[in-house]
């Protein structure tokens, strides 16, 4: 499966409004949904350097700042209005998935974390 297929099938297909996969090493964009431009790749990779990193800065994705509600070396979750963002680091990439009011925060986290587990289990 291509990286774009993970975005299209596993994230957008599960109800996320927009999503991207970034390289964990440098924050480069590997795949993204149409019109979703994640220019903050380096800043997103920095969120996973130490527990709590996102609490000081918030989570900046596609020009929006999300208030951090979880931040550790694997996952960073943020809220903005009725929606939010879930970022999860695997061995090689970072899942960045934005949801709106059509997807509950717990469901959003569960979907992204399960995809991350699958990728990790497959050495990705």
From Swiss-Prot:
InterPro entries: PFN, PFN_euk, PFN_sf, Profilin_CS. One of its GO terms (cellular component) is cell cortex. Pfam families: Profilin (PF00235). SMART domains: PROF. GO terms for biological process: actin nucleation; cell motility; exocytosis; hyperosmotic response; mitotic cytokinesis; negative regulation of actin filament polymerization; negative regulation of phagocytosis; pinocytosis. CDD domains: PROF. This is Profilin-2. It comes from Dictyostelium discoideum.
């Amino acid at each position: 499966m291509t990286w774009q297929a993970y975005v299209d099938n596993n994230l957008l297909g599960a109800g996320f409004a927009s999503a991207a996969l970034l390289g964990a090493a440098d924050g480069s964009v590997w795949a993204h949904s149409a019109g979703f431009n994640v220019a903050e790749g380096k800043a997103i990779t920095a969120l996973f350097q130490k527990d709590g990193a996102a609490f000081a800065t918030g989570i900046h994705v596609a020009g929006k700042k999300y208030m951090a509600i979880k931040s550790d070396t694997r996952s960073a979750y943020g809220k903005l209005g009725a929606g939010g963002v879930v970022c999860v680091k695997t061995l090689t990439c970072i899942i960045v998935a934005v949801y709106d009011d059509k997807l509950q925060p717990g469901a959003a986290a569960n979907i992204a974390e399960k995809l991350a587990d699958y990728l990790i289990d497959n050495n990705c």
